[in-house]
Each structure stands twice: as structure tokens, then as C-alpha cells.
């Protein structure tokens, strides 16, 4: 399995070599500014680009399969790409500019995190996600929802592995479409003036980050952003959430 630091440097190199106007965002930015390193408990590496400058196809071309990256299936309305390689994931987020603000859209299952039924929805989401995407078993059973949830995953993972091998790409797309017939669009939103960028040196390479990263992080994580929270749940605790309800159109 590739190390997170190596994947980060490799991804930055790909973006820099192709002159992509990107910036580091979300949990990856938090680790760089607060911890002076990538967060060891973070599941992915977060980059952002402007939606009006690049299409998903533009980014997929530079993270092509011959570089070892595989795209996870996702909803058309999601303004992001999830690129998996050797058990790790790189997320490319496409931010939309709208007057004096900018926002990103992700599709999530509707429901209350405090509801006793919500974990059943999460389990359902896990099953669909595992079946339609090339998620490794180790990554799949890793859970942020406690030991009981992890145990349930371990009990059902073997039949899911067998079933996944039998499914065609067409069936996988139909599965994903039907499972997300109604969903909620949620993401982060920022004042546009906070998304101005500068170059810094990190891990011996040049990277692009917001000019005022502390303000961006405070806007996202709150006044206590400097206090580590390994079990942070963005959909519950994010301070700058953007919400929109839509129905599915297409699968990519």
C-alpha cells in the first residue's frame, strides 16, 4: 500500500506538471497548517479547483488509469472526483463561484445523525458503495461508527466481495442510481474573498493554499479548529454548510 505522504507528493506533482490551478483544502489543509503534517487519521487527500476552469474529464485525463488511479462511481450532481489508488483516495473538489461566495456540492443520504435509524442508512450506503466501487476490504471495514458497526461489516464483507465480482458496470450504475433516488446535496460554502491563494513549501515541494489559511479553517471548523478531533463528522460539525435538495439525473 502506498504511503499517504508519497501519494500526496505524487498527486501534487501531477497537478503542477499539468499547470492545474488548484489549492489544498479541507482536512488536508487542516493537517498542513495545524499539525505541520498530513492528518494520520484522515481517509483521503483533498484538493480543489474551480468548476468554471476545469471539467471532470480534464482532471481524469491527467490522473489516468496508466498512472494507477481508478475513478469511483459517483452522482452527476456531485462536484467532486474520487480517485482511488492502492488503498488510498485522492478527492478533487470542483468549487462553484456564485457572486460573492463559492461552494462545493456532495451527495449524502438524508436523515438525522442522532436518529436511531440513521446507522441503518449508513450500512445501506456502505453496501452499495462497496458493490459499485473498487474499495479494498481493509478500507471498507474501517469504521468511524464504532465497534458494533465494524463487526457487522466484517460479517457481511465476504458475500459482498463475491457479489461484486459478478456485477457488470451497467448493473453497478443502476444500483447506484436506484439507491440515491432522493438524496441531499450538502457541502462547504465560503466567502469568495477567502479563496485567494499563495505558494508555500511543504515536504520539499511547492503547493498552493489559501492566502489566509487560518481564517479558512476557522470558518470551516470553528474557533477551536486548533484542537484535534479524530472523530470529527463534517455533516454535523461543519460551520459553513451549504444545503440543497435535488433528484438524481445521471451517474458518472
Label for each model-derived stretch:
Residues 30, 55, 98-100:
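Surface-exposed, flexible loop/turn segments at secondary-structure boundaries
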Residues 36-57, 204:
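Catalytic metal-binding acidic patch
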Amino acid at each position: 500500500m502506498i504511503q499517504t505522504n508519497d501519494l500526496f507528493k505524487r498527486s501534487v506533482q501531477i497537478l503542477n506538471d499539468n499547470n492545474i490551478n488548484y489549492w489544498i483544502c479541507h482536512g488536508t489543509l487542516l493537517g498542513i497548517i495545524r499539525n505541520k503534517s498530513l492528518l494520520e487519521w484522515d481517509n483521503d487527500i483533498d484538493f480543489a479547483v474551480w468548476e468554471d476552469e476545469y471539467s471532470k474529464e480534464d482532471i481524469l485525463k491527467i490522473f489516468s488509469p496508466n498512472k494507477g488511479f481508478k475513478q469511483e462511481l459517483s452522482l452527476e450532481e456531485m462536484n467532486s472526483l474520487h480517485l482511488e489508488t492502492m488503498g488510498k483516495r485522492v478527492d478533487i473538489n470542483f468549487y462553484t463561484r456564485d457572486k460573492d461566495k463559492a461552494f462545493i456540492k456532495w451527495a449524502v443520504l438524508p436523515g438525522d445523525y442522532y436518529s436511531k435509524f440513521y446507522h441503518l442508512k449508513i450500512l445501506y450506503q456502505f453496501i452499495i458503495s462497496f458493490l459499485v466501487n473498487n474499495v479494498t476490504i481493509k478500507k471498507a471495514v474501517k469504521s468511524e461508527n464504532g465497534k458494533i458497526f465494524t463487526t457487522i461489516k466484517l460479517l457481511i464483507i465476504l458475500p459482498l466481495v463475491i457479489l461484486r465480482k459478478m456485477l457488470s458496470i451497467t448493473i453497478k450504475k443502476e444500483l447506484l442510481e436506484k439507491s440515491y433516488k432522493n438524496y441531499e446535496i450538502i457541502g462547504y460554502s465560503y466567502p469568495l474573498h477567502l479563496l485567494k491563494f499563495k505558494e508555500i513549501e511543504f515536504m520539499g515541494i511547492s503547493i498552493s493554499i489559501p492566502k489566509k489559511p487560518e481564517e479558512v479553517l476557522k470558518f470551516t471548523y470553528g474557533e477551536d479548529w486548533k484542537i484535534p478531533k479524530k472523530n470529527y463528522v463534517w455533516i454535523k460539525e461543519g460551520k459553513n454548510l451549504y444545503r440543497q435538495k435535488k433528484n438524481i439525473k445521471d451517474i458518472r
